[in-house]
Structure formats: structure tokens, C-alpha cells
């Protein structure tokens, strides 16, 4: 069993955190986020740290304990530094560009794909083959990156498509004559 939940979450400098029952709110230089914990988890603010404890020792409560602590740590990191996910595009004629705030992708379809990012997410295109998705909500940044990758995921024979920058594609050998 993981014991990550036992460690209190320190509130970083420059962030104000408040605990109101099951809700933790964090305000920082990048914005404001909140997390509502399950009823089986109790939250307390002690010595500039959020202490997460399960209400009872049921398996269900213990399973939500570490997750709640990690979520609180994530909102603190998000309002302080933010999160970003980098994507790379491989393939002849595959490229990305920005049209205002929308992302335009040429991925070998008969039409260009236009992706409108949700509120709170910023998309940057430093090169036509690179996309950087950034924001303060870790889950939302990952979701947007996954949606962009889904338009044309990397294929195993030539590696063409959209992939995460840190992703390794297992390549397959073509058929032999």
C-alpha cells in the first residue's frame, strides 16, 4: 500500500490556501483552483500545510487518501508554476499553425483540422512541427494534449502522426518480400 497520503502538503511561498470543510482553494500568481475532497477524507490546515487523513480505515477511504493528497499538491503546483505538455508532429506535409487562439492542423486529411482550446488552456506553436499545451489545471492540460494527439496518433511503421515529446513509439518491421 502506498503511504503518500501520510505526508502533509506544504503550501508553497506566494500561494494562499484555504480549507473550508471538504474544499481546498489555492490562489497564486497564475490563477485560482479548488479541489473538493470525498466525504471519507478530512482536511485540515496546520502549520502552513494541508493535512489529509481518512475519516475511517475502510479500503475505500484509504484508496482515496493518497489521491486526494496528490490532487491538492497538483493545484498548488498549477497556481504557482502551471503545467505544460509538448507534442511533436512527424510526417510529410503534417504541420500545425495558430489561427488566433485556435490550432489549425494539416494532418493528411482532405481538410485541415481546427481545434478550439477550452477556457484556461493556452496553445503555442514554436515550430510548425511542435505544439505546446499549457495551463494551470493538470487534468485539463493532459486532456487537451490527448485530444490533439487523437486526430492522428503515431503509426508504428513510419512513425507518422502526432506524438508526445517524451513518448517512444515501438516501431514495427514492414512485410518482407
UniProtKB/Swiss-Prot annotation:
Gene Ontology terms describing biological process: cytoplasmic translation
Keywords: Ribonucleoprotein, Ribosomal protein, RNA-binding, rRNA-binding
Molecular functions per Gene Ontology: rRNA binding; structural constituent of ribosome
InterPro entries found in the cross-reference section: Ribosomal_uL6-like (IPR000702), Ribosomal_uL6-like_a/b-dom_sf (IPR036789), Ribosomal_uL6_a/b-dom (IPR020040), Ribosomal_uL6_bac-type (IPR019906), Ribosomal_uL6_CS (IPR002358)
GO cellular component: a single term: cytosolic large ribosomal subunit
Record's subunit section: Part of the 50S ribosomal subunit.
HAMAP family in alphabetical order: Ribosomal_uL6_B
Function, in words: This protein binds to the 23S rRNA, and is important in its secondary structure. It is located near the subunit interface in the base of the L7/L12 stalk, and near the tRNA binding site of the peptidyltransferase center.
Family: Belongs to the universal ribosomal protein uL6 family.
Stated name of the protein: Large ribosomal subunit protein uL6
Organism encoding this protein: Rhizobium leguminosarum bv. trifolii (strain WSM2304)
Gene coding for it: rplF
Amino acid at each position: 500500500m502506498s503511504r503518500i497520503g501520510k505526508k502533509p502538503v506544504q503550501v508553497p511561498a506566494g500561494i494562499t490556501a484555504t480549507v473550508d470543510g471538504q474544499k481546498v482553494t489555492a490562489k497564486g500568481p497564475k490563477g485560482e483552483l479548488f479541489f473538493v475532497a470525498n466525504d471519507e477524507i478530512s482536511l485540515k490546515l496546520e502549520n502552513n500545510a494541508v493535512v489529509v487523513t481518512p475519516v475511517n480505515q475502510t479500503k475505500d477511504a484509504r484508496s482515496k487518501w493518497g489521491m486526494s493528497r496528490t490532487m491538492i499538491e497538483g493545484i498548488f503546483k498549477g497556481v504557482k508554476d502551471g503545467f505544460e505538455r509538448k507534442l511533436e508532429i512527424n510526417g510529410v506535409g503534417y504541420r500545425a499553425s495558430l489561427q488566433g487562439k485556435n490550432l489549425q492542423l494539416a494532418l493528411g486529411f482532405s481538410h485541415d483540422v481546427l481545434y478550439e482550446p477550452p477556457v484556461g488552456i493556452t496553445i503555442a506553436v514554436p515550430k510548425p512541427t511542435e505544439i505546446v499545451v499549457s495551463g494551470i489545471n493538470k487534468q485539463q492540460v493532459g486532456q487537451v494534449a490527448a485530444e490533439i494527439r487523437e486526430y492522428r496518433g503515431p503509426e508504428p511503421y513510419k512513425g507518422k502522426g502526432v506524438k508526445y515529446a517524451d513518448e517512444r513509439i515501438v516501431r514495427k518491421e514492414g512485410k518482407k518480400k
